[in-house]
Amino acid sequence: MPDILIRPETPADAAAISALTTAAFANAEHSDGTEAQIIERLRAADALLLSLVAIQDGHIIGHAAYSNVTIGGQDLGWVGLGPVSVAPTRQAGGVGSALIREGLSRLKTSRKGCFVLGDPGYYARFGFAVTPGLTYPGVLPEYFMALRWDGAPPQGEVAYHPAFTG
């Protein structure tokens, strides 16, 4: 990936991130079309723990959001990954992977682990795996995965920030 810069979002990036996210999920069969609104609600609630953009030739071509999650109603130091958006013309080219790896690298010293809801075939390459004792309501267990950095794996029901449900 030549000449791609990954950096935290700035306030000036918000509109481009929204447009990118809408385009990235436009034809995704698993999408309900609310990903851009989720990011906007997380931003408005000051709940984006980390929001990274990938820039090439002055344009945002990718974005990854990370926000706190609760387990059993408690903040145990875990974070949730998502949404992750890549421009349709750049998908399957490593941009999303680069954003995820950078975000995980930045968070692993300050958080205990990360959750993701998504394709196990994709997210396993980053170390995500189904973790017994952790649940996320309404999804098949194989699509809800964790990556643990510190301590014993927690148990309980995981909840993303309320911005994910409106």
Predicted feature residues:
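A short beta-loop-alpha structural element at the N-terminal edge
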Residues: 4-17
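Hydrophobic pocket/interface hotspot
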Residues: 17, 21, 123
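Active-site rim helix/loop that mediates acceptor-substrate recognition in acyltransferases
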Residues: 18, 25-65
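Conserved GNAT-family N-acetyltransferase fold
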Residues: 52, 62-64, 79, 84, ...
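A conserved beta-turn-beta hairpin within the catalytic core of GNAT-like acetyltransferases
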Residues: 69-80, 91
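Conserved acetyl-CoA-binding loop-helix of GNAT-fold acetyltransferases
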Residues: 81, 86, 92-105
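Conserved active-site alpha-helix within GNAT-family acetyltransferase domains
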Residues: 108-141
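C-terminal "cap" of GNAT-fold acetyltransferases
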Residues: 115, 136-166
